Every structure is written in C-alpha cells, then in structure tokens.
Curated annotation (Swiss-Prot):
Subunit record text: Heterodimer of a large and a small subunit.
Gene Ontology cellular component annotations, sorted alphabetically: [Ni-Fe] hydrogenase complex; ferredoxin hydrogenase complex; membrane; plasma membrane
Binding site for [4Fe-4S] cluster 1: 63, 66, 161, 195
Function: This enzyme recycles the H(2) produced by nitrogenase to increase the production of ATP and to protect nitrogenase against inhibition or damage by O(2) under carbon- or phosphate-limited conditions.
Cofactor: [4Fe-4S] cluster; [3Fe-4S] cluster
Lineage start: Bacteria, Pseudomonadati, Pseudomonadota, Alphaproteobacteria, Hyphomicrobiales
Annotated protein name in UniProt: Uptake hydrogenase small subunit
Native source organism of the sequence: Bradyrhizobium diazoefficiens (strain JCM 10833 / BCRC 13528 / IAM 13628 / NBRC 14792 / USDA 110)
Signal peptide: 1-46
Catalytic activity: H2 + A = AH2
Cofactor: record remark: Binds 2 [4Fe-4S] clusters.
Amino acid sequence: MGAATETFYSVIRRQGITRRSFHKFCSLTATSLGLGPLAASRIANALETKPRVPVIWMHGLECTCCSESFIRSAHPLVKDAVLSMISLDYDDTIMAAAGHQAEAILEETRAKHKGQYILAVEGNPPLNEGGMFCIDGGKPFVEKLKMMAEDAMAIIAWGACASWGCVQAAKPNPTQATPIDKVITNKPIIKVPGCPPIAEVMTGVVTFITTFGKLPELDRQGRPKMFYSQRIHDKCYRRPHFDAGQFVEEWDDEAARKGYCLYKMGCKGPTTYNACSTVRWNGGVSFPIQSGHGCIGCSEDGFWDKGSFYDRLTNIKQFGIEKNADQIGMVAAGAVGAAVAAHAAVTAVKRLATKREDADHNS
C-alpha cells in the first residue's frame, strides 16, 4: 500500500500506538475543533477508513513563520499530522530532497494524485516584471503556483501573506505581491490568516478536511468560521476592565501592572477576528495580550498599512468605547460613587425606621 493510500489508523498502529491512545487522540481532536465529544466517533471512523490526504506545500514571498508555527502544534501534535494524518509529499522547507530531486517529487505527486491533493501555499506570488521577483526551481513562482493549482482538490492559503498580501504588499508594493485568491480564481480557497496563524488552527483545518472529506464552513472572506467567527475582544480576559473603563495609559504604569485593558495603547482586539483569546499560543499557554502587549490585528486585511500599532482605534461603536474612553473611568467611578451613596442613604432610612418602631413599641 502506498504512503498516500494508507489510513491514519494503519500508520499509527504500525508505530505501536494502542487503540486506547487512538480514541483519546480522537476525543482531544474533537474538543480542539469545538465539535464536542460526540464527534470523536466520527473522527475515529474517518481516520480508520479514509486514506491519508496527499498535501503539496509551496512557498512564495514569505518569512516561513507559518511553518514555524505549524511545527509547534500541540493538538494534534505536528508529528501526528505530518507523519500519520496526511501525506506531506512535498515541502521544500522541511523535505530531505533538494534541487532536481525535489522538483521530480513535485511532478510525480501531481501526476499520481491528480484532483486529490491539497495545495497548501505559504507566501504569495509577485506579479510585476513577469513574476521575476520570486524564482522557484528556475521558474517564476506564479507559474509554478498556477500549474499546481490546476489539479488541486482545494487550496489552503496559510497566513496573512497568502491570504491578504501582508508586508510584501505594503504600499507602494513595488513587486506587486498578490494574495492567492487574486491569482487562482477557479478553485476553492481556505484562508487561514495571521502572521503567523495559530498552530492549532492550522492543524485543525487539516484535521477537519481529513476527517470529514470536505472544507470547513467559511465566512464571507473565505476564513473557517470555527476559528474566525469571534473577535479577540469578545473572549479577552481583560474585557471586564474595558467595560469598567479601566485602561492602561502608558507602559508599565500601575494599570499595566494590574492587567487593565490595553485599548488605549492601540490594541486591535475589538476589530480582529481570530481565536487567540480562546485557543491561545504555545499549547494554550498565552497570547500577546496576556503577555502585556496589545493585539496588532495581524489576521485582518491591510493591517500593515493602517498606521501605527500603538494608535488607538477611534471608529469602534460598542459599550465602553463610543462614549470616549477618556471619560469612561470617570463615569464608572461616578456610577460606583452614586451607588454607594444610594446604598448608604437607604441603610440610614432603614435604621431610622427601625428606631422609630422600637420607640413606639417601648412607649
């Protein structure tokens, strides 16, 4: 049986993994995808019966941060995803082959799995001067991308570079760096933005496709809803401070040490859709806001050209912002003071009434 036609289960059994451990893996995977424990049996059945999905991973203009993130996935571990769940037949960054040998593997994979492989793209193609600003295997990357996209089942655009253009496309964009969906228009494309995306988001998308044999539900921008349906602000652990009007005014002030909201320091959490505040990074250990720095909005289109990362958002309409953040703390303090005064007044009235009742009773 060929490497790509083996199932995930047959591979892990050959590696000495017990069935109990396999079902534990399926349960953890279902939970990490937000599907609940009932989906574990479906995942187990799929991984037992479906052949591993062949994947071709290509690199355009990028810094490889998406690959760096991917290899740090904890749920599932990247070794399980790469060595067992999928058949990663080509990735010129981590594969042993190089040069003509690597190109031969690419052509062989394309011919052998025509219409069945997933094309994962990290980075983007520059279109200016015939694509000569990015050469891969002696050809402009854009030509290679179009050729491999023709026979792909689906395309995954990893990171902000492939999804939106990112810093390579920053104005005036001399190389004409272009997002994947602007070049390939006849194939389904899953955008997984971020600079880089969260590791578990990347492996989660791969796991979903492998398990259910279809693409995850996408939003209107082409992002998987399971990871990009909520703003970071919605689940941020500092949200109560935002609602209470408690903001960091400058780095290392008392409010910063107390963990108050970073909105005034330029945090883009209120306008950024991602899973950072729920999935978090490094196996769920932390995320930028938790480490004391505001969100820079790296999963949103055009974040690199929207001014300083430390400029406060001014066009947000929601509780806590539309009233002017400078006044919220004063208003909140006033409200608390009024509540305390009202409570004291009510208590005094009750005590006075009690004394009168006692006096009437004694007389």
